[in-house]
Amino acid sequence: LHQPYFCEENVWQLLRSPELPDPRAAVFVTNAARTVAMWGQRAAARDPIVWDYHVVLLLPRHGLIVDLDDRERPAWPVEAWLAHAFRRDVDEAFAPRFRVVDGPEFVATFSSDRSHMRDARGKLLQPLPPWPAPFDPARGMNLMRFVDLADPIAGVVVDAAGLVRIATE
């Protein structure tokens, strides 16, 4: 399943799949300013695109990142993906940080009512996925808590070297 512009839900759906090997994790790509420059994204007519956040799947034992929004291919060895998707010489304001959340924990805690995909008047910014929103009223809309790297909601926050360590341990 894949719906453009709903990367967090795409990863949430993948993490629920019994076919995926364990361990597995959700990786939020963002930074304090919410301005991450990424290359190779399908949503961009030309590179780079600047995302407020992006979410990919990590398969640590395999050292693989699954990015369903990548133009070239969906699965990459983590170091190759980092070299492909980011540039070392980019201004710090556009450099990525990563929140890595264990798959089962993300599936159990993530909740989105999709309100972030509506403008001030309530108009949809992008077409909705065909599946129901992964919203739990008891948790409320918590997507932006995962994006906020200072929020201790779940997982660990690391730089690129830390992501490589997690992916290859």
Q: Residue spans of the language-model regions?
A:
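A structural boundary/capping signal
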Residues: 1-169
